[in-house]
Curated annotation (Swiss-Prot):
Cellular component GO terms held in the UniProt record: viral capsid
Gene Ontology MF, one: zinc ion binding
Keyword Transit peptide set for record: no
Zinc finger (CCHC-type): 384-401, 403-420
Keywords (A to Z) from UniProt: Capsid protein, Host-virus interaction, Metal-binding, Repeat, Viral budding, Viral budding via the host ESCRT complexes, Viral release from host cell, Virion, Zinc, Zinc-finger
Family: Belongs to the Ovine/caprine lentivirus group gag polyprotein family.
PROSITE patterns per record: ZF_CCHC
Chain segments carrying region Disordered: 415-446
GO biological process assignments: viral budding via host ESCRT complex
Keyword Glycosyltransferase tagged: no
UniProt protein name: Gag polyprotein
Domain notes for this protein: Late-budding domains (L domains) are short sequence motifs essential for viral particle budding. They recruit proteins of the host ESCRT machinery (Endosomal Sorting Complex Required for Transport) or ESCRT-associated proteins. Nucleocapsid protein p14 contains one L domain: a PTAP/PSAP motif, which interacts with the UEV domain of TSG101.
Length: 446
């Protein structure tokens, strides 16, 4: 390592861990990462450009100052590519200094760009805080955990604007998306462990994904216990997760390492679930096909869940949840009809029993009959009445009220429907029903 740097010391000892973390950031989609030489080149170049602050140690405050000055520099046409590399490397070092873990150089640039976009909003917020705390330190690493003049720190709740912005990103891009990870990594550097976990729990998202995230956090906790035996100066899992602490206690300086570990665990869990979601054979992507029976769908789903590297309780939860949410529409309706309100908690066996007839010929005929069944006419009009006589049960063209039978002379029916005609088939037609014809003649002689 060259003998040049802050305060003329060998290298940059204050950035030893930061450079080590920065070397894990990928340059692009491949496996190539930044090297220690890349970081030293960027730092030495910046010290050469801005000689007025060369002797100052590389704190986060100096990085912000250099970043603002670097934006005002206009590079020559032949050195634009090197200038872009210089900015990108500085962005990665700044993210590592703030405790963030971006996967790629582009992600680091996105985090710094997002911070620039929020700079105007932060200025108004800082003015209000400075009015309340005139002796507030300029270093903003742990804000809103504010350092007080009398000693100690005070805790400030997460603002509603920040919470709503995180909610919007989670709804638009997903709970385990890279956009949500960047937003959370930016804001959560100033939160307590309790703040981080509470905000994550209140975010919108798939319940199965939340269970997987919780499972990954439990795995990180178990790994911490194995690698760090209990001791006087060893953090416990409860301290890291903020269990049994008030916000005031969690905001103190002795909990800084616990907050950083909690945020690191959450970021690791989000990335693990995201990689799991995009991996072939992911159970959450297995859905029932149109021509597939429910039994075949369940067989594929259970096989995929059993191969997942998660704990048994999470596997059980995924089986119960995905067996309903990933089923076809017909099966979901059938389960709702049979199981009712307990459909979400019902076992896989109960759901298979409820859907055993879905897809059969009898089930298809039942659906067809329901579709062809005429709707019941129920309304204010009621039963239709005859416009001629006003009575219900027939139309005006079928009304018999004004009809006279030409056989019996009675009203209400036609001659073809006359019962008297049917009962006496030998009766004469025409006027014979009136009796014998009277022939006029003179009276008898007395």
């Amino acid at each position: 390592m060259a003998t040049q740097g802050s305060k003329e010391k060998k290298g940059y000892p204050e950035l030893k861990e930061v450079i080590k973390t920065t070397c894990k950031i990928k340059v692009g989609p491949g496996k190539e990462t930044l090297t220690e030489g890349n970081c030293l080149w960027a730092l030495k170049t910046l010290d050469f450009i801005f000689e007025d602050i060369k002797t100052e140690p590389w704190t986060l405050t100096k990085m912000y100052t250099v970043w603002e000055k670097l934006k005002q520099v206009t590079p020559e046409e032949t050195s634009k590519r090197e200038f872009a590399s210089l900015q990108a490397t500085l962005a990665c070092i700044m993210c590592s200094q703030m405790g963030m873990r971006p996967e790629t150089v582009q992600a680091a640039r996105g985090i710094i760009s997002m911070k620039e976009g929020l700079h105007e909003k932060q200025e108004d917020k800082e003015k209000k805080v400075e009015q309340l705390y005139p002796n507030l330190e300029k270093h903003r690493e742990v804000y809103p955990i504010v350092n007080l003049q009398a000693g100690g720190r005070s805790w400030k709740a997460v603002e509603s604007v920040t919470f709503q912005q995180l909610q919007t990103v989670a709804m638009q891009h997903g709970l385990v998306s890279e956009d949500f990870e960047r937003q959370l990594a930016y804001y959560a550097t100033t939160w307590t462990s309790k703040d981080i976990l509470e905000v994550l729990a209140m975010m919108p998202g798939n319940r199965a994904q939340k269970e997987l995230i919780q499972g990954k956090l439990n795995e990180e906790a178990e790994r911490w216990v194995r690698q760090n035996p209990p001791g006087p100066n060893v953090l416990t899992v409860d301290q890291i997760m903020g269990v049994g602490q008030t916000n005031q206690q969690a905001s103190q300086a002795n909990m800084d390492q616990a907050r950083q570990l909690c945020l690191q665990w959450v970021i690791t869990a989000l990335r693990s679930v995201r990689h799991m979601s995009h991996r072939p054979g992911n159970p959450m992507l297995i859905k029932q096909k149109n021509s597939e029976s429910y039994e075949d769908f369940i067989a594929r789903l259970l096989e995929a869940i059993d191969t997942e590297p998660v704990t048994d309780p999470i596997k059980t939860y995924l089986k119960v949840t995905l067996s309903f949410t990933n089923a076809s529409t017909d099966c979901q309706k059938q389960m709702d009809r049979v199981l009712g309100t307990r459909v979400q908690q019902a076992s896989v066996e109960e759901k298979m029993q409820a859907c055993r007839d879905v897809g059969s010929e009898g089930f298809k005929m039942q659906l067809l009959a329901q579709a062809l069944r005429p709707p019941r006419k129920e309304g204010k009009q009621g039963v239709q009445k005859c416009y001629y006589c006003g009575k219900p049960g027939h139309l005006a063209r079928q009304c018999r009220q004004g009809i006279i039978c030409h056989h019996c002379g009675k009203r209400g029916h036609m001659q073809k429907d006359c019962r008297q005609k049917k009962g006496n088939p030998t009766s004469q037609q025409g006027n014979s029903r009136r009796g014998p014809r009277v022939v006029p003649s003179a009276p008898p002689m007395l």
